[in-house]
Amino acid sequence: MITDQNSKPQQGELPTTHIDALTNSFSQFLRIEATSGAVLLLATVVALTLSNSPWSDGFRSLWETPIGIQIGAFQFLRSLRDLINDGLMTLFFFIVALEIKREVVLGELRNPRMVALSVVAAAGGMLVPMGLYLALQHGQPGQHGWGVVMPTDTAFVIGCLALLGSRVPPGLRVFLLSLAVVDDLAAILVVAVGYSRSIDWTALALGAVGLVIIRGMALLGVRNIRVYFLAGAIIWLAVNASGIHATIVGVILGLMTPTAGWVSDQRLGEILRKVLSYPPGDHWSGDTEDNRALQVAGIAVRETLSPVERLEAMLHPWVAFGVMPLFALANAGVPITIKGLINPVSLAVMAGFVLGKPIGVTAFAWLGVRTGVAIRPAGLTWGGLVGGALLTGIGFTMALFIAGQAFQDATLNAAKLGILAASVVSSVAGLTLLCALPRSDGTPMFRGRRGGGEHP
């Protein structure tokens, strides 16, 4: 039996064991903002390396492996890549929707004046790249890929900001994260509306009935998360059969998730005071009433957190360090060739991200502030905003996802090369500018050492 007699917890903290030293360090590792982006980058490098190696054929065929089940007349068969893109990515979209709802109800997006700049800038960061892409691809086979250049990859942007650490003004961090939330919401709508197949209305109606049932369970007070996941899986199957991209199920369920806890803070305080009223010591009776009080306290502590907060804390590590790297491995692998890089689709994608994104974000943000629609956060200079706008050209995850819906074969490979090249150029350009900008005290955000070891 594990005991805590050798542990020395601080007052008000839980006792610890030897294994906690390892698990707590790992938890801290997962909480580092840059880690998710670093793991995603590593998966991308692995995919690109294997796709341009002697093992490329085997690597590509791995993701085409058919996987499925058959029960009587019912058969569900998909390739491994499709299961990741359509199935596991539903969890990614679910997390995105949870973050959007949390920010709208509880976070930075509550204040219309604070969020106006991000909304206006995000609109420019989607419309200008899309317009530039369509101008270059009008009447061409790649015209259907207009949605590829709209999104911003939150994980990579956060990773870039984390590299700069405390040198990043808080206003810039809030601005970019809010902008990425708006971008994600728009990208979700693009996938649902712009890249769905012909619709089977019967299957779609079954999915809608499932959503009504989930809403009814919530109103009745059903709190077992497993029941909701089972219902969500059934709804996913129905929507997948309808022709609408099934990842939209994750979005809808995320937006339906309550933001209020079942147990109020006042009720929690009353329950904990009852437990604390027992005299301290080793004479805990262990009778049914005492055990019941502890069980109620445990449930109350858990249920004080809203379902949005609990689900985000539970699923986010799995999505960030499992689903997204798998997605990168399955989709980022593409043969790197000069012919692919100079393909008109690749060049249009690069132009949309590298030029369209920063121009659109900066111009619309300036117009928003100039017209009084939005205000610039304290500490966020125009130079910092331009540096952040350059980082929004990192499309990656959502861009690869939309490209997979819009293109096939050679055109898809060209779009992927454009996305990867644009992400590299945008990250280097954004970081370089942000490092060169002065702090509020007039010193550069980044300074290197001179040969003599003295600082300028």
From Swiss-Prot:
Family that this chain belongs to: Belongs to the NhaA Na(+)/H(+) (TC 2.A.33) antiporter family.
Biological role stated in the UniProt entry: Na(+)/H(+) antiporter that extrudes sodium in exchange for external protons.
Superkingdom in the source lineage: Bacteria
UniProt protein name: Na(+)/H(+) antiporter NhaA 3
Keyword Transmembrane helix attributed: yes
Keywords linked to the UniProt accession: Antiport, Cell inner membrane, Cell membrane, Ion transport, Membrane, Plasmid, Sodium, Sodium transport, Transmembrane, Transmembrane helix, Transport
Catalytic activity from the UniProt record: Na(+)(in) + 2 H(+)(out) = Na(+)(out) + 2 H(+)(in)
Gene: nhaA3
Entry keyword Cell membrane: yes
Residues spanning the membrane: 32-52, 87-107, 114-134, 145-165, 174-194, 202-222, 233-253, 318-338, 347-367, 382-402, 417-437
Any one annotated GO CC term: plasma membrane
Gene3D superfamilies to which the protein is assigned, alphabetical: Na+/H+ antiporter like domain
Molecular function GO terms recorded: sodium:proton antiporter activity
Principal place of residence: membrane
GO biological process: regulation of pH
Protein localization: Cell inner membrane
InterPro entries in the cross-refs: Na/H_antiporter_dom_sf (IPR023171), NhaA (IPR004670)
Membrane topology, record value: Multi-pass membrane protein
NCBIfam families, A to Z: NhaA (TIGR00773)
